[in-house]
UniProtKB/Swiss-Prot annotation:
This is Large ribosomal subunit protein bL21. This protein binds to 23S rRNA in the presence of protein L20. Belongs to the bacterial ribosomal protein bL21 family. Pfam families: Ribosomal_L21p. Keywords: Ribonucleoprotein, Ribosomal protein, RNA-binding, rRNA-binding. GO terms for biological process: translation. PROSITE patterns: RIBOSOMAL_L21 (PS01169). GO terms for molecular function: rRNA binding; structural constituent of ribosome. Part of the 50S ribosomal subunit. Contacts protein L20. One of its GO terms (cellular component) is cytoplasm. The gene is rplU.
Length: 104
C-alpha cells in the first residue's frame, strides 16, 4: 500500500517502513505524528484519488530525529565595485519513519 501526502508545501509518495526527511515538524525523537493531508491512496489496482484530499485518509509516522541540512552558500557581488556579500543557510528538517497508512 502506498500514499501521496502533502507536508511542508511538498508532496511525498510513501509506503510503510519508508524513512524520509520532511520540513521541520514539532516533536521529539520517538514521538508520533499524523499526516491528514492525504492526496492519494493506492494498493494494486485499487486507487483512491482525493479532490483535493482523500476523505478520512491518514498516514502515521514516528519521528526519528531533528537535524539541519548541508550549508548552502549564497554570494552576490557587483563587478568592478569591490562589493561582495556572502551568506549561508542550513534548512532544518525532521526525519520520520512511516508506520501506518489508512485509506479511511
Amino acid at each position: 500500500m502506498y500514499a501521496v501526502i502533502k507536508t511542508g508545501g511538498k508532496q511525498y509518495k510513501v509506503s510503510e517502513g519508508d524513512v524520509l526527511r520532511v520540513e521541520k515538524l514539532a516533536g521529539e525523537a520517538g514521538a508520533s505524528v499524523e499526516f491528514d493531508q492525504v492526496l492519494m491512496v493506492g494498493e494494486g489496482d485499487d486507487v483512491k484519488v482525493g479532490a483535493p484530499t482523500v476523505e478520512g485518509g491518514k498516514v502515521t509516522a514516528e519521528v526519528l530525529g531533528q537535524g539541519r541540512a548541508r550549508k548552502i552558500e549564497i554570494q552576490k557581488f557587483k563587478r568592478r565595485k569591490q562589493y561582495r556579500r556572502f551568506a549561508g543557510h542550513r534548512q532544518q528538517f525532521t526525519e520520520v519513519k512511516i508506520t501506518g497508512i489508512s485509506a479511511g
